[in-house]
Amino acid sequence: KNPKLVTYHKPIFNEKGDKAIIEIRSLDNKDRWITILDLKLGDLKEIDHQHDAAWIGGPGISGWNQSQGALGWLENDKSIWYQSEETGYSHLYKKSISKLKKTALTTGSYEVRNAQLSIDGINFYLTLNKKHPGNRGFYHLNYKTKVLTPILENDGNYKVKISPDEKDIAFLYSTMNQPWELYTSKNKPNAKSLKLTNSKSEQFIAYNWRKPSLMQFKGNDNVNVPARVYKPSKEGSNGAGII
């Protein structure tokens, strides 16, 4: 086989500074290598190889070969964490750099949309579409126990920013028929949130916004496709539909 043209991403150094995670992407967007560079030995070791005949990409992976995926060190630099679509969904994994033992930290018919490791290196702060493909909920994951704790899980979309000390969060929240608003709360389960904005006009509030029902239908590839259904009133219904 002919060698592939590749691009190297910026190094992610461990605390000692003697090793670095290097992500390598093929320019045809079909291969991704996660490697460890040992600066003392000048050695580059393959940790994980991902291949997709169509296109490498997805949440935490990046569909563009010049953009780095979500990566980092774990367990006092004995392991790394990363995301992969090997199951068809983007999930979180850890892998030891010595024995190359891989462990799935998340599994299921949903995707990890965003992952951030906590300061203490024990918990991941995750954005998941766990309840529905269109939702974006916020969760804590203890990667050692694999206990997943919901923090923000109502139907809709949460965009979360964590304070530097990780005690508080600020987030935008919207639903199917309500626009984005800004909130703050403690970064813990069942915390009371404080709404900071009210962006809706009087005309918007006065309008009777329809709340669609949710459904899924099979696509040509036999994969479920999520959709919203807006049903007309019985008086105006003629059996027609618009997709």
Task: List PLM regions with ranges.
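Non-catalytic accessory segments flanking enzyme active sites
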Residues: 1-2, 7-12, 17-26, 30-36, ...
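A short beta-strand motif characteristic of beta-propeller blades
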Residues: 45-46, 55-58, 101-106, 147-152
